[in-house]
Amino acid sequence: MPAEFARHSQTVICWPARSEIYGSRLAEAQTAHAALANTISGYEPVTMIANPQDLTAARNACAENVDVVALEIDDAWFRDSGPNYVIESGELIATCWTFNGWGEKFVPFDKDATIATRWAAHAGHKTRKINMVLEGGSLNVDGAGTLITTEQCLLHPNRNPKLSRDQIAERLCSELGQQRVVWLPFGLALDDDTDGHADNVAAFIGEKTVIMQGCDDKNEADFSRCATNISVAKDAGLTVHEIPVLPYVVTDSVRAAVPYLNFYICNDAVIVPVCGHDADSEMLALLGEFIPDRDIIGLEIGEILSRGGGGIHCITQQIPAI
């Protein structure tokens, strides 16, 4: 499985469709997804998947160079429902894992349970179905054999209760071409929707080199959780760069974190969720020091995406270049 920071042939995003999670702000979420697609399209090709009834609205909101296609979906978190791509013997393969709505929390999910294979068929990609529950946001790889994930998510009984930790690690390595799994204990404290996805706390930017989300407020549960994760990563031999500030927002009486770490690395740029926090400029500059060869772009869509339960990384999926 190539790293996210390797070259892409394109990015795939979905048009928000689940009004239950956004309520009266669904249109705002749709605008945010379009803004992200339009930004990424300045660096690489982008496809926007939309329900047939939303096709016109999506096309009107997206730039002309964004390809909008009609495929039925329940929700818009394509990082989790979409395929994880591997390259084997020079051939691109879409690995299509079992999707169960994040432990059957969000129903219905029958359309999202098949979107990986339907998208791959539309794109003409070879597929491999895998009988194990997995979301793409629960892992990250460095492209050199190391995969990072969280115990909180992958060992949760609502995912694969009959599989042991070792069995899960073995399956990840065999299907995604990895040599080892680094198990972080935690996701973020308020990440109840996904049970602690890794893409809120860790992102590889090089071989055995990872950026990790920290927290500078000792009164937050994430202060100790992030510190423990960082310690575990260092003990695993990883070079760790820390983003020390973790913003929180309250939207419609719901409190959520907006981690800078939930960024997306596309060709020649890093797109970062921001929410008007005092530290936004400083943290974007820090990311520029960690990743000096790419443009660092902050998009102020972090708050609305957090209302839906995720961030920029959660709604994107890269297709590796061959």
PLM ranges: what are they?
Residues 1-322:
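The feature marks the mature, well-folded catalytic cores of soluble enzymes
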